[in-house]
Amino acid sequence: MNNLQKGTILTLLKTDKMNGNYTNNYWFSYKDYLNPIDDFTDFCCECLEGKHEYIALIENLINKDKTAKIFVQVYGLEDNDSVITADTLIVFSQLSLAEIKHIFHEPKDIFPDDIGEQTDFSQPTFLVGDNGELISITELSHGEQSVYYCWWD
């Protein structure tokens, strides 16, 4: 994740916390968020080396659906605002829910606690782009793709 993205998400999460307003969702490209050398991001309590397993899982999905787009939904700050945390992947894919579940349940050690189809988009949701800009998810969706969530606890 680059410094522009870090600055944007820090500002957004701190502002939401200060205002007690948690209505917006923020996403990052999985490549930006799961960078194995970036200790600013934590996914399912895996700050550095553990991210490789999630990347391999995602790449397996992308090999089966070349049109898939995978995002990480950020939910908070930890360690005196020095780390952003997440435990949910958002998947745009042409694959069925059964196929997504099969892919994510293949590894025995990191499978998610819950996988389902995301149908409620009533909360404002934004992708934090490469330049720190906010992109509405309405600009990301394609009619031929379903949207799924994969949540780890």
Predicted regions and their residues:
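Long, contiguous N-terminal structural blocks used for assembly/anchoring
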Residues: M1-K108
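Acidic, proline/glycine-rich low-complexity IDRs
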Residues: D114-D153
